Amino acid sequence: MSLCTLEINLSAIKNNYRLLQDICTTALVGAAVKANGYGIGAMQIAKALIEENCQYFFVATSEEGINLRKALNNDITILVLNGVFTHDALELIQYNLTPVLNNLKQIEIWQKFSNLKEKILPCYLHFNTGLNRFGLNYDEIEQLINDRDLLKGLDLQYIISHLAASEEMDNPYNLAQLNRFKDYLEYFPNVKASLANSGGIFLGQDYHFDLARPGAALYGLNSLIEVSYNLSYKEKFERNTPALATTVCINKCADVNTRLTYKVPLKGSYRLQNPVTLKAPIIHLQNLTLDSHIGYNMTFTTKRDSIIATLPLGYADGFSRNFSNQGEVFINSRSVPIVGRVSMDLINIDVTDLPPSEVFLGQEVEIIGNYCTPDKIASIIGTVGYEVLTSLGSRYKRKYIS
């Protein structure tokens, strides 16, 4: 077993969920637990959130859904975002999983199995409003509008879409997608809707509809970035959203020459909590003289006599090689630099400036925590906090704190 410990504070995740519930005053709040709960434990997270009355859980694949269903009661709704395929349709039915249908072919498959089983099957529909990754396109939606028999035998419970730039609060693409979504929903007046991911929740109540489905915010990740738009709405809209630049959409977005501003509900009064702490012990210490080389390819050379500590984790554990000679870890709240190349199983840190009483074999080093959050780590290596969490390896000893 690994010497490193990954602690997941379930109370922090529950706190984040309650915060999001407080913002979504007119909508239910589900939870995205795909990719094993963003790498930190889908089953444990789901069980904790059920205690907060969360009833909707989103996974990516049928396999993820089956694993989650085995841990949860049958009355909890589990949504499979990738939809249904011929090879897994029977398993979705067996394990009471609801597919999010992304194209007419998936609708056809689900309807076929509805006929085969002689039962009405639940489903969500995903409408593409501009992310252009998944979802029924305009032509397919038009077919559904004109031929409702395409949904015969199916219990359409929700229509969803996904925002492409929700973390950019002033991005006009958000409003364009919102209006496109509303246009589509007019043809399905009795069907509930879901649009807001984590960033969408903070865009305001217009984006909440009936169900929000946060992921990042549950795990303490920042779902908002600051972007300044100096172009007028129309200029920005026409330049960056050609797929949606229709007269209908532009006219429905109010004054096209007005810069958009969004207000975060109660901005500043809410703080998401980081639920993840990764700790590793010092397993080796060595004294090196001036001009000693450290690690593969000698990419770091000491500029003084130095004390170098080795920690038992590396890129096989999701600690990116991009941290080589950059980034920091913490010992008793003191910053310690990473030196040399990150290798598969080991990293080196320079502890020369620490008090001698804090440098010893077995000393606990914080890799991820309140001093170095996933978002901060991500900013160092040019990625996002989501990737930091989902990359965490399987070798860590995991400890769940209630």
UniProtKB/Swiss-Prot annotation:
GO cellular component terms, A-Z: cytosol
MF annotations from Gene Ontology: alanine racemase activity; pyridoxal phosphate binding
Top-level taxon of origin: Bacteria
EC number: 5.1.1.1
CDD domains assigned to the protein according to its UniProt record, in alphabetical order: PLPDE_III_AR
Co-factor(s): pyridoxal 5'-phosphate
Sequence positions bearing N6-(pyridoxal phosphate)lysine: K34
Enzymatic class: isomerase
Gene3D superfamilies assigned to the protein according to its UniProt record, in alphabetical order: Alanine racemase (3.20.20.10), Lyase, Ornithine Decarboxylase, Chain A, domain 1 (2.40.37.10)
Gene Ontology annotations of biological process type: D-alanine biosynthetic process
SMART domains: Ala_racemase_C (SM01005)
Protein's pathway: Amino-acid biosynthesis; D-alanine biosynthesis; D-alanine from L-alanine: step 1/1
Catalysis: reaction(s): L-alanine = D-alanine
Keywords carried by this UniProt record: Isomerase, Pyridoxal phosphate
Domain RPE1 insert stretches: 226-271
UniProt binding sites for substrate: R133, M344
Pfam families according to UniProt: Ala_racemase_C (PF00842), Ala_racemase_N (PF01168)
Active-site residues, record numbering mapped to chain: K34 (proton acceptor), Y296 (proton acceptor)
Keyword Mitochondrion: no
NCBIfam families: PRK00053.2-3, RPE1
Family label: Belongs to the alanine racemase family.
Name recorded for this polypeptide: Alanine racemase
Gene source species: Rickettsia typhi (strain ATCC VR-144 / Wilmington)
Gene: alr
